[in-house]
Amino acid sequence: MSQVNMRDMLKAGVHFGHQTRYWNPKMGKYIFGARNKIHIVNLEKTLPMFNDALSFVERLAQGKNKILFVGTKRSAGKIVAEQAARCGSPYVDHRWLGGMLTNYKTIRASIKRLRDLETQAEDGTFAKLTKKEALMRSRDLEKLDRSLGGIKDMGGLPDALFVIDVDHERIAITEANKLGIPVIGVVDTNSSPEGVDYIIPGNDDAIRAIELYMTSMADAVIRGRNNVAGGTEVYAEEAAAPAAE
């Protein structure tokens, strides 16, 4: 079973919250105190909650369920994309498009357009077009890939969301709540834990903290998949295969 320890969290700075004047009273029970006007998260509370979330993700992965990783702010995007790709999971790292879950039918049509453009780019169709038309399609492809590239192989709605910074990704959480999709979220001292089923109280800004959350979650997915698929490679191949639209 995937586990993190106190040392890992201290090293990553998970305990450093936001300035005390920005605190959200709903996070009060997870705050240990303050130092230099910065709230300190009580890691003795975070530890079991983090590990509960990891166990939940591992169980989901064992049942071949899909976990969608969401982190669109600058400090999170690259790490989210790298770790999601490592464990063969869908992700959103650039911008959450309204309706990504609640209007999935429209999103599915955009994914089909993305796939069509990818095919055209590979089979030489672009080369046969006028320079202007080829440039327009290339830009369209780039834009769609940036927004939807991480979910193009998802093949349907996810079974859970893992979110870095619940305030920044509030639209995603609201959509998941409407559809009854469980939400796992990193919740800092200035944020509201509302709508989050598995709360991980902690720093949602520091790169090292984000790396710890994402690496641990990706490891949990891989561990769960290995229990049924016999290896990460098997799952990575499954995830890379184009989903039926």
Swiss-Prot record:
Pfam families, per the entry: Ribosomal_S2 (PF00318)
PROSITE patterns: RIBOSOMAL_S2_1, RIBOSOMAL_S2_2
GO-annotated cellular components: cytosolic small ribosomal subunit
MF GO annotations: structural constituent of ribosome
GO biological process, one term: translation
Keyword Lipid metabolism: no
Keyword Ribonucleoprotein in record: yes
Gene3D superfamilies linked to this entry: Glucose-6-phosphate isomerase like protein, domain 1, Helix hairpin bin
Keywords, ordered alphabetically: Ribonucleoprotein, Ribosomal protein
Domain of life of the source: Bacteria
Family: Belongs to the universal ribosomal protein uS2 family.
PANTHER family documented for this protein: 30S RIBOSOMAL PROTEIN S2 PROKARYOTIC AND ORGANELLAR (PTHR12534), SMALL RIBOSOMAL SUBUNIT PROTEIN US2M (PTHR12534:SF0)
Name of protein: Small ribosomal subunit protein uS2
Species of provenance: Pseudomonas putida (strain ATCC 47054 / DSM 6125 / CFBP 8728 / NCIMB 11950 / KT2440)
